[in-house]
Swiss-Prot record:
Domain AB hydrolase-1: 45-356
Catalytic activity: L-homoserine + succinyl-CoA = O-succinyl-L-homoserine + CoA
Phylogenetic classification of the source organism: Bacteria, Pseudomonadati, Pseudomonadota, Betaproteobacteria, Burkholderiales
Native source organism of the sequence: Leptothrix cholodnii (strain ATCC 51168 / LMG 8142 / SP-6)
Listed pathway(s): Amino-acid biosynthesis; L-methionine biosynthesis via de novo pathway; O-succinyl-L-homoserine from L-homoserine: step 1/1
EC numbers, comma separated: 2.3.1.46
GN (gene name): metXS
A Pfam family that the UniProt record links to this protein: Abhydrolase_1
The protein's name: Homoserine O-succinyltransferase
Record-annotated active site: S151, D317, H350
Length: 377
């Protein structure tokens, strides 16, 4: 299948302060983004891709300096792929507070000239959506043909239909939920605590000390990675396989292949991800709850939505189970909204939304065909 080839990141800077849900404001900020495909004459074929916790604006294609830098959803987006860049103008944007180029904790605080660190304001899903809307304003795009996201990205897609209902034609919400369960909040808290209690964290101002709280980041990633996989997929990939033929009878050495894998994932993550960003994004996950202002009534919260919806879940995803997706579907049906639902039998757990499953991609391809057919001709 034809690929996008080399792509280039772009930037857009904003001097007008972005009001945040916390009551604070983000001033003089920059958003990094990428686009794929061509915006049509009436600017009606734009699709926004919202990223999850440790992803970025680099959704598809590769960079010229590294053919190994494939975008995180490259199997989905490109010429002839389910989200076909021959038909759609696709936008990926890095959210404020992240660590992949948009203004975040590693950037200078205009008030001090030093990195924000822990002083970066707390951001929410709603704040990200408002920042994305400003980016679209700058690109001259009044309305999206569709917005799509998986996991935390799905929460952003849902939020788009509530905060800017007139600007969204279709919303594709994949492997997501209307809010986090207590168990998910607990996982996030344990991961944050691992980072905060790392001696190299220095209350979030570790940049000035020339260190990185890698121990905490490693543990946080190991915890998170376990939740992204299903028991079946871990058993199939690792089982009880040992690293060597004989047991070492040690409490500290690596004995099992799954231990080695988790440590590898933790080591890799700690080399590129920012600790303060991890705290910010997991807290944004915790805070997302559109029904909160409606006494917990999700149907009432979604009444303002005008988009058409596709909701997708995966049978072995225990972090955001199919039950959570069905909550969204029911609330939309309560409001007589146009919603399609697909529950994909897949063994891969939460990470299934990132993989090239033929049934899953078949559903997305068919739905984007519908979106394309509704574009002005």
């Amino acid at each position: 299948m034809v690929t996008l080839g080399h792509v280039t990141a772009q930037q857009m800077s904003f001097s007008d302060a972005l009001p945040l849900r916390s009551g604070a404001a983000l001033r003089d900020y920059t958003l990094v983004y990428e686009t794929y495909g061509t915006l049509n004459a009436d600017r009606s074929n734009a699709v926004l891709v919202c990223h999850a916790l440790n992803a970025s604006h680099h959704v598809a294609g590769t960079y010229a300096d590294s053919d190994r830098s494939e975008g995180w959803w490259d199997n989905l987006i490109g010429p002839g792929k389910p989200l076909d860049t021959n038909r759609f103008f696709v936008i990926g944007v890095n959210n404020p507070g992240s660590c992949f180029g948009s203004t975040g904790p590693t950037h200078p605080n205009p008030a001090t000239g030093r990195p924000y660190g822990a002083d970066f304001p707390v951001v929410t899903v709603e704040d990200w959506v408002d920042a994305q809307a400003r980016l679209l304003d700058g690109l001259g795009i009044e309305r999206l043909a569709a917005v799509i996201g998986g996991s935390l990205g799905g929460m952003q897609a849902l939020s788009w239909t509530l905060r800017h209902p007139a600007r969204v034609g279709h919303a594709l919400i994949i492997a997501s939920a209307p809010n986090l369960s207590a168990q998910n909040i607990a996982f996030n808290e344990v991961a944050r605590r691992a980072i905060i209690t790392d001696p190299d964290f220095h209350a979030g101002h570790f940049y000035a000390h020339g260190v990185v709280p890698k121990r905490g980041l490693r543990v946080a990633r190991m915890i998170g990675h376990i939740t992204y996989l299903s028991d079946d997929s871990m058993e199939a990939k690792f089982g009880r396989a040992l690293r060597s033929a004989e047991l070492a009878y040690s409490t500290q050495e690596i004995e099992f292949q799954i231990e080695s894998y988790l440590r590898y994932q933790g080591d890799k993550f700690s080399e590129y991800f920012d600790a303060n960003t991890y705290l910010l994004i997991t807290r944004a996950l915790d805070y997302f709850d559109p029904a909160r202002e409606f006494g917990g009534n999700l149907s009432a919260a979604l009444a303002v939505a005008r988009a058409k919806f596709l909701v997708v879940s995966f049978t072995t995803d225990w972090r955001f189970s199919p039950l959570r997706s069905r909550e969204i579907v029911k609330a939309l049906l309560d409001n007589r909204r146009d919603v399609s639902y697909a529950e994909i039998a897949a063994p891969h757990g939460h990470d299934a939304f990132l993989l090239d499953d033929p049934r899953y991609h078949g559903v997305l391809r068919a739905y984007f065909e519908r979106v394309a057919q509704e574009l002005p001709r």
